[in-house]
Amino acid sequence: MIVLGIESSCDETGLAIYDYSKKKLIADELYSQVKLHKKYGGVVPELASREHIAKLNLLAKKIFKETGLSFEDIDCIAYTAMPGLVGALMVGATFAKTLGLIHNIDTIAVHHLEGHLLSPLLDHNSNIEYPFVALLVSGGHTQLFEVKEFGEYSLLGESIDDAAGEAFDKTAKLLGMGYPGGVEVANLADQATDKSKYILPRPMKNKPNLDFSFSGLKTAVLNTWYDEQDQSLENKANLCYAFQDAAIDVLVSKCAKALQKTKNTRLVISGGVSANKLLRHQLDLLAKNRGYQIFFPPMKYCTDNGAMIAQAGAYRYVNGFKDSNLEINVKARSPL
């Protein structure tokens, strides 16, 4: 069974073709709008939607030409339906529905977060058995789930304010750095010369629950930098290190608690922040020291992409899900 996946929830236009029977990604294409939005310091929804309109058909033509496949080979078209920018979601959903009607192909709505959660399966070496704990950590979400089977997601904890990735981006903005901020902060943190110069709080780290809070950490960065008389690049790097160290410390601590609480031994990490080198290193240490198995997405699939939507759509389709080609129902916000 072969599925075409379409991702358009924010500022990445992604198409991919996934073969469920072989559990193999056949092809994927991605167009990033980062350069377009960089001068605005963040994503402009109207521009994002227009770029999706301009690029979707071009990417579709390219992916079919490169694979030698045609729409006759496609069994299902999966598209991101929620959550995301409504205009951007509408573009992708309309494109999917139109193709479905023209070529008489079933369509299936995919939850963006489910796509991320399953993205480690895109690594051919990943053989993830249920149940497991999943940390979904991105610019819009920071959530811990217990996953007992496909489609059975029990929320264990989440951020009560800023998501971790959002805190990275806002910290970058506070320090006058570029967009996307998370990458800028992580890169500058690598240049720290005095890693103990700044000590920042670890919000909710010692709380018994599995919720997160990052707004206080962001405020601590603001106050620390405001009070710093020597706002040199060197000290900015030291502060980036302190921020990243605190944020990652909280994430790792909560993962450890979640594994203990649920008595699971498998941990799956996904979302844009899963590409962070320090997070991967610290979680690898946790797994090694306590005998856990840990799974990350391939680096290229940490951020939004069509491959994760094609794969999640394939899993949903074989489990009996599909929707009417005449209905379009997208949502800006929707829990998994």
From Swiss-Prot:
GN (gene name): tsaD
This protein's GO CC annotations: cytoplasm
Record's cofactor remark: Binds 1 Fe(2+) ion per subunit.
Compartments, as annotated in UniProt: Cytoplasm
GO terms of molecular function: iron ion binding; N(6)-L-threonylcarbamoyladenine synthase activity
Family of this protein: Belongs to the KAE1 / TsaD family.
Protein name: tRNA N6-adenosine threonylcarbamoyltransferase
The UniProt record lists the keyword Iron-sulfur: no
Catalytic activity: L-threonylcarbamoyladenylate + adenosine(37) in tRNA = N(6)-L-threonylcarbamoyladenosine(37) in tRNA + AMP + H(+)
Stated role: Required for the formation of a threonylcarbamoyl group on adenosine at position 37 (t(6)A37) in tRNAs that read codons beginning with adenine. Is involved in the transfer of the threonylcarbamoyl moiety of threonylcarbamoyl-AMP (TC-AMP) to the N6 group of A37, together with TsaE and TsaB. TsaD likely plays a direct catalytic role in this reaction.
Binding site for Fe cation: 112, 116, 304
Main location: cytoplasm
Cofactor: Fe(2+)
PANTHER family for this protein: TRNA N6-ADENOSINE THREONYLCARBAMOYLTRANSFERASE, TRNA N6-ADENOSINE THREONYLCARBAMOYLTRANSFERASE, MITOCHONDRIAL
SUPFAM superfamilies on file: Actin-like ATPase domain
Class of the enzyme per the UniProt entry, highest EC level: transferase
Keyword Hydrolase appears in the UniProt entry: no
Organism field: Francisella tularensis subsp. novicida (strain U112)
Keywords assigned by UniProt, alphabetized: Acyltransferase, Cytoplasm, Iron, Metal-binding, Transferase, tRNA processing
Binding site for substrate: 136-140, 169, 182, 276
